[in-house]
Amino acid sequence: MQDNSSHSRESASAGDDPLGIDKLTVDYDYLLYKIRDYVQSIQLDTTELCKKQNEVMVNGIIENTIDKNIAKFKELLEKCDTLENHYEMLNQLAIITDTFKERIAEAVNNYNXLKKGASKSK
């Protein structure tokens, strides 16, 4: 009997693993390592992708907001230009009415002068 127990000790110390449990343990540990490494790789890729997507969204939102603001400012500038044109028209009307008053007064004076001249001729 002692021969059997000493034989099993010698087999174990020699690395003889008839069921392959040691190899299975190493393979299992290696598989866990690969899975963990793969998950970390996916995590890093996902994190990087999410950061890039966030930047795109933030920049896109900012760009859209800026574009909308620029469009609104252009509309305001167009309205200001239109308003300025209306004021120019008012100024032109003021000039026309001022000169119109002068021309009417001159026409009335000329008419009166012609009327006086016609009265003297009779």
Swiss-Prot record:
Keywords, sorted A to Z: Coiled coil, Cytoplasm, Transport
Keyword Transport: yes
Region annotation Disordered: where it falls in the sequence: 1-21
Subcellular location: Cytoplasm
Broad class of where this protein is predominantly found: cytoplasm
GO BP annotations listed: endosome organization
Transcription is among the record's keywords: no
UniProt GO cellular component terms: BLOC-1 complex; cytoplasm
CDD domains, sorted: BLOC1_CNL1
Top-level taxon of origin: Eukaryota
Coiled-coil parts of chain: 63-95
Biased composition (Basic and acidic residues): 1-10
Family, as annotated: Belongs to the BLOC1S4 family.
Complex formation: Component of the biogenesis of lysosome-related organelles complex-1 (BLOC-1) composed of at least BLI1, BLS1, CNL1, KXD1, SNN1 and VAB2.
Function of the molecule: Component of the biogenesis of lysosome-related organelles complex-1 (BLOC-1), a complex that is involved in endosomal cargo sorting.
Protein name: Biogenesis of lysosome-related organelles complex 1 subunit CNL1
Species this chain originates from: Saccharomyces cerevisiae (strain Lalvin QA23) (Baker's yeast)
Gene that produces this protein: CLN1
